[in-house]
Amino acid sequence: MHDAPLRTLSRYRAVLTSAARHGLSRWLAVTALPAVLLVPLLTSSAARVQAVGDGPSGGAVPTANWALSGSASADSTESGNPASNAIDGDAGTNWCTSAWTGTLTIDLGQVRSLDDLGITLDSASPSASATIKTAATSGNWQAVPAASNVALDPGNPMYIPLPPGTRARYAELTVYSDTGADVCVGEFRTFGPDPAAAGLDFGSDLSFTSQELAAGAKFTYHGRQQSPVQIMRENGANYVRMRLWVDPPPGYSNLASDLALARSVQAAGMKIYLDVMYSDFWADPQHQDIPAAWQGQDLAQLTSTVQSYTQQVISAFAKQGTPVDMVSIGNEIRNGILWPVGQVNDPTNPADYDNLATLLKAGVAGARAGNPAGHQLLVMMHYDQGGNNSLSQAFFQNLVTQGVPFDVIGLSYYPFFHGTISAMRQNVDALAGQFHKKIVIAETQYPWTLANGNSPIGDSTGNFVWQPSQLSPGYPASPGGQLSFLTDEMSILAQVPDGLGAGLFYWAPDWIPGVPWEPGTGIGTPNANLTLFNSQGVALPSIGLFRNPAAVCQSYDPWDVPCVVGG
């Protein structure tokens, strides 16, 4: 492990401690580029980017893991590690053989078009090899050419390309231990075009883009230098998330800079997701400060202010021809907004939500009033505990009981703070069943390395995630591990009951070394290993998470060690 994080300043240690207790807070800030400079920086290739088309993957049906909706059986199973663990969407749960070899069979329920297969062998498993077959009808097995006695690397995800035109209902995985010990498989994936995934919105929070470009950062995708906006769009993103503060310090995310970014986003052919924080600076479960200009207002006055402010903001976007498509009334509002007036001190007490509900209703009313006639505006309520169902259900039930109108359940899900991907899946499925609303992962990240990256600009700041104990079992801190985690997360959303899985947004994919987390500190970014670009701004495989994983892995240079490809 790199030792730089161990030398972190005491102030930064406090940040990590608070984040670990409550979730990844968003009070870490950097200066913003003047709004007038945003448009030329972000739209130099707008015409070409716009030609990609609407929706993820530029109109092509995205690839997802069909095994999640299938069933599994095995001829050799160790007690406590059933076959179903291999297709639950979580590489941290295992199917284990009870002998040196065993065969796992997946039934997808119907014949599917398949592009490739994915396998993660548990990191504690002995080294092993595997043979894979597929069949369109029971018993008519066809060998997979690239998976005949292929070596598996414990702990590292592997992708096996299938012959073009493969259609199958069944997939059979036979594993052979190299040592004679039992073999444990974390996940066996069957990837193919999934119409449910085509309905997902895919985007990222690009609020740092202007600062990075101003600092001299350069971003490349397969050797072509482009803006992060262009690169994300080319890889299927159809949304950009942007934060908004009321009256931030000069250069920060204010209305003028957001309007400029919105023009760039629209020019690139994407939609706008506005995160209204109702604060002059970062707002999250630890900070929800009333803006300076609103200080001293009581509940009635704040209610009026919130409604008029929200209406003015939404109207401003509409007037310049870039209407907002989705708005979050507050950011990670588990403990309320506009403290202390709208604070939730006791989440178990329904009466504690009275003031919050009043303020949220005002925000929704303002957003609806500012939205132009005929334009669809989705309203989100954003909760941070994406892996905790009991807390999530209680929060949204209180909002529903109070009559707060909203269209979308937004969740932050950082596995190093919010639990396993299985817990996230259980949460989104249960929320869909209880509330019958669209569900969006509004913020997510996973590390591609544990090293503290250095760019030509330089950065010695410790990272949010710096040690193996913070990783999710089955997902190494590598480009391949990051891709594996995000494809599993996306596949889970595509399988949410009743098609209510609505979208996935990656937080700060371009916050690479060179931009400090607080102006004037000279510290840098603690996010450098959680991006979708390496420290030199080169796009990582996860940029292409909607595509065939085997093809994505094969298209990257070996020096980057993106993932292991069989065959």
Set out the residue ranges of the language-model regions.
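Conserved, mostly hydrophobic/aromatic
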Residues: 204, 275, 327, 409, ...
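Aromatic-rich peripheral "rim/lid" segments of glycoside hydrolase catalytic domains that contact
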Residues: 214-217, 426, 430, 449-488, ...
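Trp- and acidic/polar-enriched beta-sheet ligand-binding modules for extracellular glycan
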Residues: 77, 98-101, 123-193
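Glycoside hydrolase catalytic-domain groove-lining segments
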Residues: 228, 374-378, 390-471, 480-481, ...
